[in-house]
Structure formats: structure tokens, C-alpha cells
Regions:
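Glycine/proline-enriched, intrinsically flexible loops and inter-domain linkers
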Residues: 1-506
């Protein structure tokens, strides 16, 4: 049965606390609950259509590829690569944060997908990104209030990606940079990460009496309400109102956690990262169907003065939450000391299906986990099905008829979407780890854009390819054909660098 939050608290006969309201807002946000993807859809004629998430899953279910280990659940998709070895893949946008704080938004976007790979029990080995901005020569006088010049946004985003990837020691190996006026106010920052594991075992649910252990960074006010902010429509006031929603990245701390988890896979039962919602989302998700009790005063803070809801909801970076059996806590603590990673026990999983949070032993939140995760109202949406424009205009643009072939060629080569992106690619270290067998820039002097890249561990005689397909302008005329064209381009690119198309995944 579905309840509104007001009905839920009325039936309990209590007033909600600020911690409870913030937790529900985060858990039910578009960013976390994917309400649009899960919405019931009807067309203009009244016909029902599958939800978007079911449509996305349908092709994977239909193909039923034997090498797909896990999809549409958990932190990342997982495929088998070679006997005893698996790969995890995760991509995620960080658009709103990058629009109001380009460096920090892109910086923590990279950190977030890296932690998702860690949460899938894989070791990160490479990063990707697709970036779309407004035209760099946009007249600043024409920009809406509160919108940064596209050149400033672009430079900040690229700086943020380079800073995190280079410092953490992961190669940024594949991507794209595109420009269009449609991305002026809200850029596309689509970060990705690939990880590998030689010992992947599907996680089990936390068990009653398991300890809730937080590893890595400390909690601060950065990243407050990030999940709800990312689900909002932006306007001229967004940067001022939501500036604190952008987290502060710390790649060195995250690198220490990566190294720790590579040695600690046998010491925990379940793991996830503090992404959107911080402890609220991480513990809330892990406690679904189990229950948990948390004491917030045990959480390590960057500085004093945080309110309970701020400690619980902060999206401060580089933190992982683990479910650890009591008898393994001391071994994990010892390993944390060895790796220089902070270890904090803040509670336990209970088995009563209740999420209880206290501050100085006083309750500030008590919610049934079934209500928290399944009680949100179902969204219903009406789909307007535009007719694709599949006609062909054979008339040459007037500009082309007024210029010679040489002028046209130079104009094309100088267009931001065609011109070399080497200046961007060289900002990223794509050689670190020594596993980039086919590089993003190829040719006799290494200045030509390749079709894709190949990652092969130094002692292996095999590898895997990464390639990208992107064409947003196609979607203006025909969204369905755009998707087909992008997949077609990506497939041709992986084939061009020697990959087997029968084992490709999206």
C-alpha cells in the first residue's frame, strides 16, 4: 500500500522531525528514486506503455547474455571478462553541480563513479567522460542571469576531471567534448568508471548484529541536500541557494580507501558508498528489510557545530559504509591503521525493519524501512509521442553556395565539434597504471583521435575496448533514430580497435 508522508505520520500520531523529513525528501527524490523512469505511462490515446525502466531492462532480459553477471541493481553493471575475472561499469551525470560550481561538480562526479565501482566490490582501473557545453564564443551579454559563460564552465569542468583522475592515479582514457547552445545553462557532465575483480562474490544482505562501519573521509556541511538539489529545476538563484550542495573532493583519501578495500574483501558482508544522501542513503538502503540503529555523535566530523540532520544527510565525499560481522571488526580496524584510513563504528543492523537514528541517545528519526523505500506515491505520466521528422532536405545551405571548397573545408576543420580535442585529452593522464594498450591519440606522432581505447594489464596478452557513440543533434529530429545511431557508432568504434562485437555491452 502506498502512503503519503503526511498520512504516515498522522497514523503514527506523531509530528515528523527535521531529520525524518530530510530523509524522506532525499530517498524519494528523482535522483535517488528515479520516479520518472518508474512512472506509469499512458499515451494520448489512453494506451498504457511499459515504464521507462522496464523498457530499458527489456532488451537485456531478451538477449540474456551469459556474460552479464549483474545489471540494473546495485552500484554498477557487472560482466564476466575472463575465467575468474569480472569487469564493473558505471556512468552517471553530474550536470547540476557542474553548472553552479564547474570544478567541484566535475571533480566529485569522477569521485562518485569511482566509489560506485568500489561499492560493487571491484577495483577501479580507468575513467571516461562525455562533456557537452554551450558554444565557447557565446556573448556573455546574452546569457540568462546566474549562468556562467560556457568557456568558464568548460575550463572548470576539465580542470576538475583532471585534478581528481590524475591525483587518484587512474587513467582517463575515453570521452567526447561537444558544443551546442542547448547546453549553455546546464552542461552535460557524464562521468564513467571501469573496475576489475579477480574474486567477485555477489553481496549478501547485512545480518542482525552486524556493525555499521564508516571508512574514509569525515563528515562536513558540503553536499547538503545534493539529492534534492539535483532533482530540481534550476533558475537564477540556484547557485546562491544550493551552492553548499556541491561536495568537496579529496582524491588522496579515496585512493587510500581503494587500496584498503583491495585487501579487505573477506572482512565485510556488504558495502556501499555515501553518495547522494550521505549516511542517510547508504545506511537507509543497506537497512531495507533489516533495520538499523545509528548514533550520530559517533560519526567523525570535519569540524564541530553540525546539526543532527546535517550529519545524517551530508554528502561529504570519500566515505564507504560497510556491514561487518562483530568478530571481524578488529581485523578490519587493524587493516585500516595499516592503510591510514579512518575507521568508525556508528551503530548496528537490528533485524526489526526499523531505521532508528539517535543523537546523544535521543531519537531524531524512526521510520519503517518498508515505508521509506516503498511508500512514495506512484508517479503517473502522459506521453506525447511526437512524429519524427525523417524527410531529407536536398537544398544546400546558402552559405555553402557562396564560398569555395577551401573556405568550406577550413570552416569545418575549425568548428569546435570537429576541431582537435588534443588540448583536452592531454590534460588527463591516460598512461598511468601502464595498462592503456591503445591510446586515445594515435598515429605516427600520436596526434590523431582514435576510434576507441584498449585496456590490457601489463602481464596479460588480452584486453578490453572502450568506445563511445554520441549525436545529440539527431535527437532534435528523431529521438529513436538518435539512439540507434549512437549505438551503431559505438559498436563500429569498438570493432575498429579489434574488439569482438558479440561480447559488447552498453
Amino acid at each position: 500500500m502506498k502512503f503519503s508522508s503526511a498520512v504516515h505520520f498522522s497514523q503514527r500520531g506523531v509530528h515528523p522531525t527535521d531529520v525524518e523529513l530530510e530523509t524522506i525528501a532525499q530517498t524519494w527524490s528523482e535522483h535517488c528514486a528515479h520516479k520518472t523512469f518508474r512512472a506509469n505511462i499512458t499515451t494520448e490515446s489512453g494506451a498504457s506503455r511499459p515504464s521507462l525502466i522496464n523498457q530499458l531492462r527489456a532488451s537485456t532480459d531478451k538477449i540474456n547474455a551469459p556474460y552479464v553477471v549483474s545489471s540494473f541493481v546495485g552500484n554498477a553493471g557487472i560482466i564476466s571478462f575472463t575465467p575468474g575475472r569480472s569487469l564493473a561499469v558505471k556512468c552517471e551525470t553530474h550536470n547540476h553541480p557542474s553548472a553552479i560550481e564547474p570544478f567541484g561538480g566535475a571533480n566529485t562526479g569522477v569521485g562518485g563513479v569511482i566509489r560506485d565501482i568500489m561499492g560493487a566490490q571491484h577495483t577501479p582501473i580507468a575513467c571516461t567522460n562525455i562533456l557537452c557545453f554551450g558554444p565557447p564564443d557565446t556573448d556573455t551579454l546574452t546569457l540568462p542571469e546566474g549562468v556562467f559563460p560556457p568557456r568558464r564552465t568548460r575550463d572548470g569542468v576539465i580542470d576538475g576531471i583532471a585534478d581528481y583522475g590524475n591525483k587518484i592515479g587512474l587513467p582517463t582514457v575515453a570521452g567526447a567534448v561537444l558544443y551546442d547552445p542547448g547546453y549553455t545553462a546546464n552542461p552535460l557532465v557524464y562521468a564513467g568508471c571501469i573496475g576489475t575483480s579477480n574474486s567477485f562474490v555477489d553481496q549478501v544482505a547485512p545480518q542482525p548484529r552486524d556493525r555499521i562501519v564508516v571508512l574514509g573521509g569525515r563528515t562536513g556541511r558540503d553536499g547538503l541536500r545534493g539529492a534534492t538539489f539535483s532533482s530540481m529545476t534550476m533558475d537564477a538563484t540556484t547557485g546562491d541557494v544550493s551552492g553548499a550542495s556541491v561536495q568537496i573532493g579529496d582524491p588522496i583519501t579515496e585512493k587510500l580507501v581503494i587500496d584498503l578495500l583491495a585487501d579487505a574483501q573477506h572482512l565485510y558482508r556488504a558495502i556501499t558508498d555515501c553518495g547522494a544522501g550521505g549516511l542517510s542513503s547508504a545506511i537507509g538502503e543497506m537497512a531495507e528489510g533489516v533495520g538499523a540503529r545509528v548514533e550520530l555523535t559517533h560519526a567523525p566530523l570535519k569540524y564541530p557545530g553540525l546539526a543532527p540532520w546535517e550529519i545524517w544527510l551530508s554528502e561529504a565525499q570519500e566515505r564507504m559504509v560497510l556491514a561487518v560481522a562483530p568478530q571481524q571488526c578488529e581485523d578490519l580496524r587493524t587493516l585500516c591503521v595499516l592503510h591510514g584510513v579512518e575507521y568508525t563504528d556508528i551503530g548496528e543492523f537490528t533485524g526489526d525493519n526499523q531505521l532508528v537514528v539517535t543523537y546523544n541517545n535521543e531519537p531524531v528519526l524512526q521510520l519503517d524501512t518498508d515505508f521509506l523505500h516503498n511508500g512514495r506515491p506512484q508517479r503517473n505520466m502522459r506521453a506525447v509521442m511526437p512524429k519524427p521528422n525523417r524527410t531529407t532536405d536536398q537544398t544546400a545551405p546558402k552559405w555553402l553556395t557562396q564560398h569555395g571548397a577551401a573556405d568550406i573545408l577550413m570552416a569545418l576543420l575549425g568548428h569546435p565539434n570537429i576541431a582537435s580535442k588534443a588540448s583536452v585529452i592531454h590534460r588527463y593522464d591516460h598512461e598511468i597504471r601502464g595498462a592503456t594498450a591503445v591510446r586515445p591519440l594515435v598515429g605516427q606522432v600520436g596526434d590523431g583521435h582514435g576510434d576507441g581505447v584498449v585496456i590490457a594489464e601489463p602481464l596479460d596478452d588480452f584486453g578490453f575496448a572502450i568506445a563511445i557513440g554520441v549525436n545529440p543533434w539527431f535527437g532534435i529530429h528523431d529521438a529513436e533514430r538518435m539512439a540507434l545511431a549512437c549505438i551503431d557508432e559505438a559498436m563500429r568504434n569498438v570493432v575498429a580497435v579489434g574488439a569482438d562485437p558479440d561480447k559488447a555491452v552498453l
